[in-house]
Design a protein with these regions (language model features):
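Short capping/connector residues at structural and topological boundaries
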Residues: 31-32, 47-51, 113, 119, ...
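Short beta-strand scaffold segments in enzyme catalytic cores
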Residues: 22-25, 44, 51-55, 165-168, ...
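ATP-binding N-lobe of GHMP and related small-molecule kinases
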Residues: 1-112, 126-151, 328-331, 341-357
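Charged/polar, low-hydrophobicity segments characteristic of intrinsically disordered regions
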Residues: 83-87, 166-175, 241-246, 250
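Short alpha-helix boundary/capping segments
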Residues: 72-76, 116-119, 232-235
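Short acidic-hydrophobic sequence patches enriched in Asp/Glu that either
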Residues: 77-80, 120, 146, 150-153, ...
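Gly/Ser-rich oxyanion-binding loop with an adjacent helix/lid
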Residues: 90-201
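C-terminal nucleotide
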Residues: 1-32, 36, 195-357
Length: 357
């Protein structure tokens, strides 16, 4: 720390971090530790839907941080950032010497079924980990902190801000949570799946069909808490372990049928857990179900490789083989957009990692 305190220059860094969509869902936290998952999850990065964040670390003033959203003050975001910085302060002692000037912007609107907190905390944590490396004298980002490399450290920090954020660090499918199916997997940070994705399941794309662009009726934090006394929680956690092992095998072997079954089943299990908790919630809307039925019908008629997944809300993610882009997008425009609010949708490729900006 003496080395760090001697270096009181202004440091500035920026990252663009993608959001991600979980295939096997993270839903429920362990009762011990900070933001540790009750089951492992796996996700694909959404490289075209991202947060861009810059952090300038200046010698400490009377405030710990100043936050702006696209250059404008956003007081409603400050409590989450303050809580995050307070939680990591013990692990990042250098923070006490600096004031952070944070500016962030998403290239997608809030309330669209995209994990904005994943992209936002992912980008912020990358900036923090980068500054940490510079303060330690590792300009090439090749230092290790508590045994973690730069990407693991970024994932570790982002997990404390938003659990799903820790899966936004990799171009490969990212696994968060201990699993016998993935070497090196951890509850503390995400790792790459570790095996090559078969050609039949690589290069897939995601169309986010926006059924409802309002605020979610239940926050992620409250939703996770519902699992604490849920009658089906243990069965769900066990099934997630099983599904993670199965989907890793499916992606490795190119078993598209198995991949589709697991992804869609996981989406429905997530909503089933919400509908059978106390209090209970129905987060799907009639148009959510209409879109799902249209996807099933089109897949049955054409045999095209595609499936849906859901977050904890009404919007639908349509995952499909990017090689079938024209056919699928014609289907989206002709059959699905009429079910979307103001015909809104977003598109992204999968499989891109964060970049320095």
């Amino acid at each position: 720390m003496d080395h760090i305190k001697q270096q009181m220059e202004i440091l500035e860094v920026g990252y663009r971090c993608p959001s991600n969509i979980a295939l096997v869902k993270y839903w429920g936290k362990k009762s011990t530790g900070v933001q540790l998952p009750a089951n492992p999850s796996i996700s694909l990065s959404l490289g075209d839907l991202y947060a861009s964040t810059t952090v300038k670390a200046s010698p400490r003033t009377d405030v710990a941080f100043v936050f702006t959203l696209a250059g404008a003050s956003k007081p409603s975001f400050e409590p989450k950032i303050e809580a995050f910085l307070n939680k990591i302060a013990v692990d990042c002692a250098w923070l006490s010497d600096y004031t952070l000037y944070i500016d962030s912007v998403n290239n997608f609107p809030h309330g669209t079924g995209i994990a904005s907190s994943a992209a936002g905390f992912g980008a912020l944590s990358l900036c923090m980990a980068h500054i940490e490396q510079l303060l330690m004298g590792y300009a090439a980002l090749d230092g290790r902190v508590n045994g973690m490399d730069f990407w693991q450290r970024s994932s570790y920090l982002s997990r404390i801000g938003s659990g799903s954020a820790c899966r936004s660090m990799y171009s490969q499918p990212a696994v968060w949570g201990e699993s016998d199916a993935v070497a090196g997997s951890s509850d503390l940070y995400a790792v790459e799946m570790g095996v090559a994705v078969h050609a039949d399941l690589s290069g897939w794309k995601d169309v986010v069909l926006i059924v409802d662009d309002g605020e979610k009726s239940v926050s992620s934090t409250a939703g996770h808490a519902l699992l604490e006394n849920h009658p089906y929680a243990l069965a769900r956690f066990g099934k997630a372990q099983e599904n993670l092992a199965s989907i890793v095998g499916a992606m490795r072997d190119g078993n598209v049928k198995s991949f589709i079954e697991i992804v869609e089943s996981e989406a429905l299990q997530l909503h089933a857990m919400m509908m059978t908790s106390l209090p209970y919630y129905v987060l799907m809307r009639p148009n959510t179900l209409a879109i799902i039925e249209k996807i099933w019908q089109f897949r049955e008629e054409t045999g095209l490789p595609m499936c849906f997944t859901l977050d904890a809300g009404a919007n639908v993610h349509l995952l499909y083989d990017g090689k079938k882009d024209e056919t699928v997008m014609n289907f989206v425009h002709n059959e699905l957009l009429s079910y979307c609010k103001n015909r809104q949708y977003l598109c992204s490729e999968t499989g891109k990692r964060p970049v320095l900006i």
